[in-house]
């Protein structure tokens, strides 16, 4: 039933856009429209399997080290820190298996099954082929399966700042420019509010034990090189695929301090909304049908919402007004974070 609904949605989109097709496309056959519909379905299937592991990773990277210490900041006390995330990519998320039975338009060239990389995987030499027939001519669509970033560890930097407000509340913000990693671009920015609760328990704070809560919002954008699909109608406009992730996070932190060293733990819960879009140069096929727009409309079918529970451990050492901290977040994945902080 779900497959039937997806095919019906595709045909409806094609019919709606056909109302605007110019005169050069009036000779299109119903057969070609059905083929384009199958091509769209295959593009959505492949996109989902390819980029989902990477957007899951982005959530872990954005969730790390929001709280550098649960201790209460004085009013207007400020800190600025430089962070570096290091994410270790599991082998299971670096590849996936495709079969000819997964596709309605493409077939795997010279094979019935193949292992191809996700966005986090390595390079591949697998090709997908299909035929478009407009009733007069046939054109081959031959696409090389997308390569991954070919890295077992994904590293990226960002800046974070915090400002002490009233009654033990703290404003926290993190930001990175559009960082170019190997074969992809990544950007994260977010804002949060932390509140210190141990201030209400003086006997506990007297033992150098502190705890706090934080609520935050972050946005992660991650873009990968995707499918360079060349046809007689030009490029299909699938050269890039972007994952757009919006995350709300709540966490509680507790720490114990021994002189200059502070050991901290955290329990994190976050909920993320995932959206996707493709981009790239548009070819002559756009004169026949707005293919890229159709793909992006179809990608709405794989929008999703996920909730994660993450644990975090960290150690922080003070050197005058400078702090050095390392942390490890763990759950489905493992992400480490190293930071240098300066308190004004």
Where does each model-flagged region fall?
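Repeated loop/turn-to-beta-strand initiation elements of outer-membrane beta-barrel proteins
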Residues: 167-171, 200-203, 260-263, 321-326, ...
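Residues on the lipid-exposed face of transmembrane beta-strands in outer-membrane beta-barrel proteins
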Residues: 69, 80-82, 159-165, 191-197, ...
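Outer-membrane beta-barrel translocator/channel fold
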Residues: 204, 210-253, 257-259
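Transmembrane beta-strands of outer-membrane beta-barrel pores
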Residues: 84-88, 175-179, 197, 215-221, ...
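Short loop/turn motifs that connect adjacent beta-strands in outer-membrane beta-barrel proteins
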Residues: 68-76, 91, 183, 198-211, ...
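Bacterial Sec-dependent N-terminal signal peptides
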Residues: 1-32
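Residues that define the transmembrane beta-barrel architecture of outer-membrane proteins
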Residues: 74-76, 152-157, 185-191, 207, ...
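A subset of solvent-exposed loop/turn segments in beta-rich extracellular surface proteins, enriched
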Residues: 28-166, 219-239, 273-303
